[in-house]
Amino acid sequence: MIKKRSILIVTRKSPLALWQAEFVKQQIENSHPHLACQILGCTTQGDRLTTEKLVDSGGKDLFVKDLQKALLNRDADIAVHSIKDMSACDGPELMVGAFIRREDPRDVLIVKGELSTLPPHAVIGTSSPRRQCQLKKFQPGCKIKEIRGNVGTRLAKLDAGHYEAIVLAAAGLKRLGLENRIHYYFDPHEFIPAIGQGAIGVECRSDDHEMQTLLKSLDHRETRLCVTAERAVNEKLGGDCFTPIAAHAIIKNDQFSLFAMLGKIDGRVIIRATEIGNSEEAKRIGFKVASQLLEQGGDSLLRELKQ
């Protein structure tokens, strides 16, 4: 029997991250029967910081850096990430070799009781500045309370009565078979999702041309174009996970549309921009939308947020 070549996949150990890695594993093995994939679970620095706010500890990059370190040290061949956890720009030594077909990108509200009985001053759990900003516009009287942990942990905290509602990504709930917990889907044009939300990125080394060729079979063109435009917005703005920035691109009837927002965390200021164009110019459209945000006062707002 010919021994199959082994591909080592590194990922976080959370149930959602392991689901995503297993999905990528199956896609690779189905497309390349001569390959066998092995998943290596990694507890990242972000996972270890269970009580501190991410904004006080280095941001969402803490969920990515340890996985990237494994790639650079050649302890793994590929890393599987949630795109929304990644920086806007790839470093010179690493690249996203495949964008997996995007799941539902919307944010959703999960309520402890019934949506109809949610009080105007409800305690809503989220740690995302983007969600906090838009929640204050959606439900001005609500009280925002920090929440950390994976999907299961957050749902358990809601069920235990620490919150009256929480906001999560629809994609994670659907992938884990928890769609029945969703009470309300936010309109992505009004409550704009995180950059790359719902998309999985498979990262590899820039000098590993064999792996890049292999990953092409997994790459979903429409997802790549949409995420490229969204990431370009943040690349030009220079925001981080502490900045209330959102961008969401869609392709419908051959029309490419990009929506973006920049705001203050208290929701008192929200700047929006929209652009329609050719999907082949995804990055240029992203830069153009970012420029529109800056021209509407986003430049001074960013300076204020970074002080």
From Swiss-Prot:
Query: What domain of life is recorded for the organism?
Result: Bacteria
Disulfide pairs here are: none
Which GO molecular function terms does the record list? hydroxymethylbilane synthase activity
Task: Kindly state what the record says about how the cofactor is bound.
Answer: Binds 1 dipyrromethane group covalently.
Is Transferase among the key words of this record?
A: yes
Record key words, sorted: Porphyrin biosynthesis, Transferase
The keyword Hydrolase appears for this protein? no
GO cellular component annotations of the record: cytoplasm
Q: What functional role does this protein have?
A: Tetrapolymerization of the monopyrrole PBG into the hydroxymethylbilane pre-uroporphyrinogen in several discrete steps.
Additional remark text: The porphobilinogen subunits are added to the dipyrromethane group.
Subunit structure, briefly?
Answer: Monomer.
Q: What is the official name of this protein in its record? A: Porphobilinogen deaminase
